[in-house]
Amino acid sequence: MLPANRKKLAGLLVILLAGLTLVLWWAHAPNASLRTVLIPDTYAQRREVKWPHRGQIFDRNDSLLAYTGPRYLLVLPRRKWLDSARFNRLLNWPDSALEARVNDLRRRELPMQLNLTVSEADTLRRHCREWPALTVREYTARNYTVHVAAPVLGYAYNAAQPFLYQAQRLARGRFYRLRNGGLETYYNTLLAGHRGAYHPLLDALNQRHGSWATDTTYQPGQDLHLSLDTELQAYAERIMGERKGYIVALEPATGEILCYVSAPTYDPAALTALSRGRERSALLLSPDMPLLNRPALQANPPGSVFKLVNAAVALQLRAITANTGFRCDQSLINCVHEHPNAHNLTQALKYSCNPYFYRVLQSVVEYIPDTLAQPVDTCAVRHQNLAAWTRHVKSFGLDTLLGVDLPREKSGFVPLPAYYDRRYGRCGWQYRTIYSLSIGQGEINLTGLQTANMLAIIANRGWYYPPHFVRSVGTSGAPLPRFRQKHHTLVDSVHFAEIIPGMVAALGHGGTAELASLADVNISVAGKTGTVQNDEGDDHANFAGFAPADKPKIVVAVYIENAGFGGLSAAPCAALIMEKYLRGNIAPKRKRWENWLRCGNLAEQGH
């Protein structure tokens, strides 16, 4: 090799060794500031977004109810022939299944799309070369593992846009009444979490040098652990069948809702599934209004169940005592069945004597203390007494929002003296004008949640926690703070102890709720029947009670429209719910009731 070439080669080797030495020194430089000597002071702006995963929903036994995951749609070709028989065999579908599913789709939905299971989607992907005209589309959606508790689970508004559009177009005036987002809407902020947006300034070595914009903190979606007992919920929906009404069951010691049925029922996935538009239309246009959240939004006269509150308030105001007796004078008001005169409050509750409670409220409204000077202004006294009665009644959580964790609820209605003043004039009304309040009729209206909460107050001897569905948010192990605040009524606890014996007697021999007795399985039940008058058809059946009577673990309120006497339909229904929750199974003698109650009352079945 020539000397000149050797010199060039040696020079190149020296340069390479010097460069390698510089790189090694650079990587291990003790002072980072030394690295900036040869680098210009310029940075790259980057935006990084971290999206949270929506929280899951579990029941009280930690069974998964709702989660976000993949779904699959089969997009059918518009004008290409498809061998349906071969297609059905491929997916193990029955003969003509494809034609039936296509016919169920609304004609205006183009292209036609069918829901697929995971296994069906995998099968089509494996055979995609044999079916080039078919497309399997994957998208992320909310999945429900159960077909119950639709008004409770609800929907997120961004996922229910097709339903909301249909509701505004088809339901028109009923849209607001039928809209109910459930827990998915009420806890949307907690379930959805918050995306994190980061704005780092990066140098040539990809090292961060602060932020070029304000960062937002990432918050993952939190899980919800409900108080709902899914097994009890499914059982309650099954025995209600297609009848109209509601069932609310809660734990009185905590206010946790165990069961919440608004009948007729529907599948919670129906409102958000892309291919179920026809089903949504049927739900919106149904005259039975299955989308109406009845326990929270339908306020009705409570009927004779309200006699419990009237008795408690009269005891507190000293208008009566537990030993007060009144004759069953049907010249005042009719009594629906024959029974002996009630010589005390226990007997009056057992027989649900209308004339007795007519006299009870009359004793409250027309009570004149001996200390008042004569002559007495009876109009002023009547206003004062009714105002006191209203104040005590409202302390039971009536005529107010209980604050349940649902987007919407009604407050019900309890009339004030001013209501009757506007209607009849200040002194234009007397007790005879308002006597219907004594038996839970007339102007008073309660929701199903209020009825159940009213019985929880009696079970607790005068206090309650607001009813709620979520017993734990995220990993906190606790509900929202406001659901841990105890509320007290204006009635002393001693007076509730005077009411409960009559509620127990109502389920004994000769009582109005004898069919709801669980004495054969050693469970003592306390309750009260109600038959709500209906001028447009059959009366509505009502019952509310709790068990065991001495240490209540469950409160149940049942309201069945057009079912007649409460003791023949609503009371047996409540008994089944209590027995299912407390024992886990139903005694053989009551097992046959399950199908009977789906279509009528026990009297119609020859019980």
Question: Residue spans of the language-model regions?
Answer:
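Beta-lactam-recognizing serine transpeptidase/beta-lactamase-like catalytic domain environment
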Residues: 66, 203-212, 253-305, 309-566, ...
